[in-house]
């Protein structure tokens, strides 16, 4: 009897110009440390995201295996096509400008194009907005992407794990994103951790 190994996952992580780069940093670190990590992590920065990343985290982003960085104007990236094997895209943090372009199918950069591909192919698209408060345009755009199949997971930390540090709070959001992406996370679970 022949057994087949489970397919290793390929995901896209897009970082946009919204504040909250620490969520993306911790997400990337945690994805690489999973018991069954993704086979490949494609990383894309929007035009202002790298600048904000460096200002907020105090460090430059350098891709390390299994992560590979793609330019936001690089439409020849494999996941810009529905024929690719990338099955999940996470936009974290997701600026309202990016969400608006996705909601209105304005595929003018690799992030918006890849999100469009995920939606049209019925694959996982997780958007992590950090903005607050929302105006009516934001709410309508969030409604549109949700109706199209995206999961909107606001960067709202939970407190039932009794977090002690900012990083503890960040990890409550990161663990939720990892769960939504279909990976096994070892994060705190309500009424399961003593």
Over which residues does each language-model region extend?
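A cross-family phosphate/adenosyl-ligand binding-site feature
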Residues: 1-126, 130-194
């Amino acid at each position: 009897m022949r057994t087949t190994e489970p397919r290793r996952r390929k995901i896209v992580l897009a970082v946009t110009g919204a504040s909250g780069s620490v969520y993306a940093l911790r997400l990337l670190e945690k994805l690489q440390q999973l018991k069954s990590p993704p086979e490949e992590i494609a990383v894309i920065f929007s035009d202002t995201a790298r600048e904000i990343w460096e200002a907020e985290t105090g460090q430059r982003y350098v891709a390390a295996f299994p992560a590979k960085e793609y330019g936001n104007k690089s439409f020849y990236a494999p996941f810009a096509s529905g024929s690719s094997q990338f099955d999940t895209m996470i936009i974290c943090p997701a600026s309202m400008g990016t969400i608006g372009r996705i909601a209105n199918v304005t595929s003018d950069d690799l992030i918006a194009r890849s999100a469009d591909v995920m939606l049209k192919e019925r694959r996982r698209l997780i958007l992590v907005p950090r903005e607050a408060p929302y105006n009516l345009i934001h709410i309508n755009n969030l409604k549109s992407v949700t109706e199209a199949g995206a999961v909107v997971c606001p960067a709202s930390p939970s407190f039932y794990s009794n977090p002690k540090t900012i990083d503890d709070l960040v990890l409550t959001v990161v663990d939720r994103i990892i769960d939504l992406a279909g990976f096994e996370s070892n994060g705190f679970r309500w009424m399961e951790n003593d």
